Amino acid sequence: MLELDIQRATDAAAPDDAAFRRWCELALRQRTADSEMTIRLVDEAEGRELNHTYRHKDYATNVLSFPADVPDDLLDIPLLGDLVICVAVVEREAAEQGKSLEAHWAHLVMHGCLHLLGYDHIEDEEAEEMEGLERELLAELGHPDPYADDETDTITH
């Protein structure tokens, strides 16, 4: 079971809680243990500050993933980690890339969840595996391949 805390730190329009739950549960279905995670929706100022603090990049990015990195058996809390999503960046990217807003939201939430599970895209082989999973998950929701029209990785972090 997924315990999901959604923190809306911005008044900007964003998907409803049910959509976030659906996307997270789909991305996390390979994890058999209970999971607890937080999604914090932020404005560009907070997104920029967090990206600068944790990644030394002076701009707001679409999604930041903070895995808990705590073994499940160490605590009685199945803490998976946190996602921070900058609403304005998601909206801007969807428009610039000609993607539906819902598909882009789904992609970024599931991308972040995969990071919480330990997937990464630093090395080419890792990126291929992670992007393949993202394509499969999005296809299950009826969304197109997020990388089809892009020669480079659309995830900015």
From Swiss-Prot:
It is an enzyme of class 3 (hydrolase). Single strand-specific metallo-endoribonuclease involved in late-stage 70S ribosome quality control and in maturation of the 3' terminus of the 16S rRNA. InterPro entries: MetalPrtase_cat_dom_sf_prd (IPR023091), YbeY (IPR002036), YbeY_CS (IPR020549). Pfam families: YbeY. The keyword Transmembrane helix does not apply. One of its GO terms (biological process) is rRNA processing. Keywords: Cytoplasm, Endonuclease, Hydrolase, Metal-binding, Nuclease, Ribosome biogenesis, rRNA processing, Zinc. Its cofactor is Zn(2+). Binds 1 zinc ion. Its EC number is 3.1.-.-. It comes from Pseudomonas putida (strain GB-1). GO terms for cellular component: cytoplasm. Belongs to the endoribonuclease YbeY family. One of its GO terms (molecular function) is zinc ion binding. Zn(2+) binds at H111, H115, H121. This is Endoribonuclease YbeY. It is found in: Cytoplasm. SUPFAM superfamilies: Metalloproteases ('zincins'), catalytic domain. The keyword Nuclease applies.
